[in-house]
């Protein structure tokens, strides 16, 4: 059998049109109308040497929520939730960080944003499947990912190396651009997530400087145990990145990760973070702790704001689910699912069309950052 890639016409149409009006509720690559855990439309495309592509049914799977239904990632923040007593102080700090670092909040796409490769290791086929517009890569060969000491720690973390044994990395996968070179693999067959930080291939062998593995993700709250995971807080990319499918669908149904420039010292952080890379040697008062959650004031009329379509989608998610501080960066920023996740399957980079060709640093122009509200420390901790 000669397998060929059939790209969803629905998905391409959504990307071409900017994708913010919602997708078809049926068809081989329909984009789900909700982030709830529903059975997704799954198809596989294949052809013989002389025939037309034929759909091959596979087990229905939902990509919308890979962690426990009780995960903080998926729990809306009630409108009457208590606020942090330092909320207004933290909001002023956030505004100062934005103003003094380029005056904007960037949407990272190709750099400092992890690709997420969804794979199936028991697919029984070498055809790419499509689940609600997301490519699912069949992988028949597992590889061991080695450790390389990019931070000159002088030791090998053997427990981490053990977690990186037998990783189903699809052929042709690439990590993100930029110095962090992040990469995520999610195996739908086993509900296992791997993350890698500063990832590279040397003589055909994969290596990474840090990361981790989460098994049985449907039973996990969406937090790597200390000290694992590729973000500074141990919060996985797959929980808080924004996907092209979500923007095409017009709705984000989870909390969003946000990176700040400055944060409270490493020993002061909030659940759900399991650690922090904050650095405050001069003991500046009232720094925002990593792991803390914030939301856009739910009383703001988002539809009345002069926002881009994507900015409006993000603002509504910020009201309902909020942001969680998961990392530090050179500018305040959010992460999209890296377009390498789609390009491996033959799709173009979806973000220029979804952003209506607006630069990534201008997509959130007009966002009401002054209306952010910070939640109490350890908000929502079981």
Please name every model-derived segment.
Residues 1-18:
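Sec-dependent bacterial lipoprotein signal peptides
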Residues 8-12, 26, 312:
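Generic hydrophobic-segment detector
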Residues 13-55:
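Bacterial Sec-dependent N-terminal signal peptides
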Residues 39-382:
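Short, surface-exposed polybasic-aromatic patches that bind anionic ligands, especially phosphate groups
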């Amino acid at each position: 059998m000669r397998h060929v890639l059939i790209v969803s016409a629905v998905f391409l149409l959504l990307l071409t049109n900017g994708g913010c009006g919602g997708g078809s509720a049926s068809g081989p690559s329909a984009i789900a109308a909700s982030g709830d855990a529903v059975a997704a439309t799954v198809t596989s495309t294949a052809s013989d040497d002389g025939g037309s592509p034929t759909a091959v049914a596979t087990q229905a799977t939902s990509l919308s929520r890979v962690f426990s239904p009780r995960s903080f990632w998926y729990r809306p923040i009630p409108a009457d939730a208590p606020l942090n007593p330092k909320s207004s102080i933290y909001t002023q700090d956030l505004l100062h960080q934005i103003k003094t670092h380029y005056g904007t909040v960037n949407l990272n796409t190709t750099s400092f944003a992890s690709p997420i490769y969804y794979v199936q290791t028991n697919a029984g086929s070498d055809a790419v499947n499509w689940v609600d517009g997301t490519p699912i890569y069949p992988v028949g060969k597992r590889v061991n990912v080695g450790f390389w000491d990019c931070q000159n720690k002088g030791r090998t973390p053997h427990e981490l190396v053990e977690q990186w044994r037998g990783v189903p990395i699809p052929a042709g996968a690439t990590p993100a651009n930029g110095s962090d070179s992040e990469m995520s693999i999610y195996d739908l067959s086993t509900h296992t997530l791997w993350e890698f930080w500063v990832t590279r291939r040397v003589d055909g062998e994969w290596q990474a400087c840090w990361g981790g593995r989460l098994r049985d993700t449907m039973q996990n709250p969406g937090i790597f145990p200390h000290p694992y995971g590729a973000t500074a807080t141990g919060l996985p990319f797959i929980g808080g990145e924004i996907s092209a499918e979500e923007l095409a669908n017009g709705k984000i149904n989870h909390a969003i990760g946000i990176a700040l420039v400055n944060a409270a010292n490493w020993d002061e952080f909030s659940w759900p973070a399991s650690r922090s890379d904050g650095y405050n040697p001069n003991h500046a008062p009232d720094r925002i702790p990593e792991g803390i959650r914030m939301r856009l004031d739910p009383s703001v009329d988002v539809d009345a704001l002069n926002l881009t379509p994507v900015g409006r989608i993000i603002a509504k998610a910020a009201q309902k689910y909020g942001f969680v501080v998961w990392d530090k960066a050179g500018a305040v920023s959010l992460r999209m699912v890296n377009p390498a996740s789609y390009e491996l399957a033959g799709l173009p980079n979806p973000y220029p069309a979804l952003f209506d060709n607006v630069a990534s640093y201008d997509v959130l122009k007009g966002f009401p950052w002054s209306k952010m509200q910070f939640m109490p420390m350890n908000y929502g901790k079981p």
